[in-house]
Structures are given as C-alpha cells and as structure tokens.
Amino acid sequence: MPGVTVKDVNQQEFVRALAAFLKKSGKLKVPEWVDTVKLAKHKELAPYDENWFYTRAASTARHLYLRGGAGVGSMTKIYGGRQRNGVRPSHFSRGSKSVARRVLQALEGLKMVEKDQDGGRKLTPQGQRDLDRIAGQVAAANKKH
C-alpha cells in the first residue's frame, strides 16, 4: 500500500513480519552464543524462542525508525525491567549491553543502520525503505482480513 509507514501498522505484527524477513533473507549475522545467553541480569532464564535474536533486531530497527540517535545505552534502558530482590524491594535493571551491541552491529552489517555523528545509531535510507515496504505488506495483509 502506498504511503504506509511503520507508525501506521500494529507494532507486534510489524516486528513479527520484520523478524521473519530478516530470518528469511539469511544475511543477518547471528552470534553462536545466542542459545545460551540471558537477555538481562534481571532475567532468571534464557528466552524460550530460539529466534529471539531476529525479533530483537526487528524491534531495535523499529525503535531506531521512531527515534533515531539511540545507542547501546539507550537500548539497554528500553529492554530493561524489574529486578526482583527476594524479600527486599524491586528496582529497575538495565538489559544486556552485549546483546544490544551485537544486534546493532548485525544491523550495521545489513546496511540498515549507520553510526550517527551526534552519537548513537540511526537508520539508513535503505533501512527506512525496507521497513516502510514491510509495513505496507503488513497493512495489506490486515486489509484482506
């Protein structure tokens, strides 16, 4: 559909569609340790989904589409959560820096993301075009239903 952007479609459906596109293309460089790692220090277990790296890459690309100039630190804040401390009160805990860094590096390898001169990363015009194209496909699929 012409004129459809990432902001116009359901974010969950868009992230699923983009993750499927990244997996199907086979160009995203996935580290070999993805099946043994936790995504944050406040998590107790590793993720159940074996394709979590593609989902995280799609979610990160969407975040960079909506607000560019985000770096590793801001990605750890976005993917942070509640650290449970047993009988003591819970506090906020950031996500994994290593996972955020590797996801951004993998997206850079696809030429979807580039380093911003003001700090952080931003979407390239090619990356923005890919995301808008997938958003159009998601909108067209929703219109059929």
Curated annotation (Swiss-Prot):
Keyword list, A-Z: Acetylation, Cytoplasm, Methylation, Nucleus, Ribonucleoprotein, Ribosomal protein
SUPFAM superfamilies on file? Winged helix' DNA-binding domain (SSF46785)
Q: Could you state one GO cellular component term attached to this entry? A: cytosol
Q: InterPro entries per the record?
A: Ribosomal_eS19 (IPR001266), Ribosomal_eS19_CS (IPR018277), WH-like_DNA-bd_sf (IPR036388), WH_DNA-bd_sf (IPR036390)
Key word Cytoplasm present in the record? yes
> Got any disulfides in this one, which pairs?
none
Listed GO molecular functions? fibroblast growth factor binding; identical protein binding; protein kinase binding; RNA binding; structural constituent of ribosome; translation initiation factor binding
Q: Which residues carry this modification: N6-acetyllysine?
A: 23, 111, 115
The record ties this protein, via Pfam families, to: Ribosomal_S19e
Sites where N6-succinyllysine occurs are at 143
Where is this chain primarily localised?
cytoplasm
Please state the span of the N-terminal signal peptide per the UniProt entry.
none
List locations, semicolon-separated: Cytoplasm; Nucleus, Nucleolus
Name a single GO biological process.
Answer: monocyte chemotaxis
- Summary of the function given for this chain in its UniProt record: Component of the small ribosomal subunit. The ribosome is a large ribonucleoprotein complex responsible for the synthesis of proteins in the cell. Required for pre-rRNA processing and maturation of 40S ribosomal subunits. Part of the small subunit (SSU) processome, first precursor of the small eukaryotic ribosomal subunit.
Q: Which family does it belong to?
A: Belongs to the eukaryotic ribosomal protein eS19 family.
Task: Report quaternary structure and partners.
Answer: Component of the small ribosomal subunit. Part of the small subunit (SSU) processome, composed of more than 70 proteins and the RNA chaperone small nucleolar RNA (snoRNA) U3. Interacts with RPS19BP1.
Protein's recorded name: Small ribosomal subunit protein eS19
Name its species.
Answer: Rattus norvegicus
Q: What is the lineage of its organism?
A: Eukaryota, Metazoa, Chordata, Craniata, Vertebrata
Gene name tied to this protein: Rps19
